[in-house]
Amino acid sequence: FEADALAGERSLPLADIWPDRPPLSMSPIRLMKRPGRSIVEKLEAVRSMMADKGAQSVFFSALDDVAWMTNLRGSDVPCNPVFLAYLLVERDSAELFVNAERLSAEAARAIAGAGIATVSPSTLHEALAAAALRGA
């Protein structure tokens, strides 16, 4: 994996092949009522595994993984309690790439309280390139 590959020209190939794409969901994203483990506990477990493997970061792109890690639920996919988002966990930080306007007040507080920053999905490309340049 080369950081330079991410730093090249940005394109939006879906715009070319799916010009009539429907708008992204604005349905609310809510906090789970009774999760088995807290967000902080899950982040600690992931960071422990990262340290064991010598990893600088973990990028979660599977919607169910993002939902599980954050204890959040949505309704972007029929019959699945997931939402469109990505999660980048580094040793000292974490970023949730999601439209923050969709988070309920309770969900926003829980995410911030766990030390996860909410970041616009439009910045994902740059964030991954920066992480790669840092060796993450």
List the model feature ranges, each with a label.
Residues 1-136:
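Terminal domain-start leader segments
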